[in-house]
């Protein structure tokens, strides 16, 4: 009787396996598919295809069998909902794919569960606004505190940049153009008081770097040209040349 039961189970399982990993006459994947790691019964993935295109939910696994990723295909706009996992089961990231590339809003987490960033993607590149968070506040105070607020264009920093102290006060602000610092940048202390200003051209300091005390008095001024700091002698020569040629010095 036991032998008969075992035989029936074997036939049933064999029948299930025979229905998996099928292709049609044109070689296109159809129906349920799964793949295992070499020399192992542990699945790499399992899901379903229709005319060679993934449909429904696909699950992917680590070599130890823990869930690595879950992707739900067939959402409006040609998108797929994605959840990626650490090997301890915590969510690593969740967002969307479009044509197998990151798209729209993605949330990223620490292995201990804290939200670390919220980023926008287009064609697998960072595009638009992105927020980055302090981990400590979520652990100690259950508070979500922004560390940086930035913007991207085609994977490069582009637009307004702001960073913050843990207490929420502005720490630094300026602008990027395609990954390079440009224009006026300002720095503040943890009380929110301006303590420094500087200008950049194509990621190089170019102009006066000025530091202030908390009362707003100038502590120091240093001139940079194309990233090079001018010594007192070089500064004197530069200003004399500008005056002689009736040229306005850089600001």
Pin down the residues of each PLM region.
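Bacterial Sec-dependent N-terminal signal peptides
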Residues: 1-21
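Glycine/tyrosine- and acidic-biased, solvent-exposed loop/turn segments at the edges of beta-strands
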Residues: 16-251
């Amino acid at each position: 009787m036991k032998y008969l039961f075992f035989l029936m189970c074997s036939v049933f399982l064999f029948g299930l396996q025979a229905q998996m990993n099928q292709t049609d006459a044109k070689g296109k994947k159809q129906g349920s598919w799964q793949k295992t790691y070499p020399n192992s019964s542990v699945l790499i993935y399992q899901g379903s295809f229709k005319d060679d295109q993934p449909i429904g939910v696909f699950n992917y696994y680590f070599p130890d069998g823990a869930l690595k990723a879950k992707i739900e295909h067939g959402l409006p706009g040609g998108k797929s909902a994605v959840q990626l996992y650490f090997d301890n089961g915590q969510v690593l990231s969740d967002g969307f794919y479009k044509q197998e590339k990151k798209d729209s809003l993605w949330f990223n987490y620490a292995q201990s569960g804290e939200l670390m960033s919220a980023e926008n993607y287009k064609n697998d590149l960072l595009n638009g606004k992105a927020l980055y968070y302090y981990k400590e506040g979520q652990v100690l105070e259950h508070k979500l505190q922004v560390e940086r607020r930035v913007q991207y264009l085609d994977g490069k920093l582009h637009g307004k940049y702001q960073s913050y102290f843990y207490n929420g006060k502005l720490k630094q602000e300026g602008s990027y153009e395609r990954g390079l610092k440009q224009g006026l940048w300002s720095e503040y202390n943890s009380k929110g008081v301006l303590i420094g200003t500087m200008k950049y051209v194509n990621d190089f300091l170019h102009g006066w770097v000025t530091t202030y005390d908390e009362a707003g008095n100038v502590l120091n001024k240093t001139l940079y040209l194309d990233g090079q700091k001018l010594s007192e002698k070089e500064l004197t020569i530069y200003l004399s040349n500008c005056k002689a040629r009736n040229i306005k010095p850089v600001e």
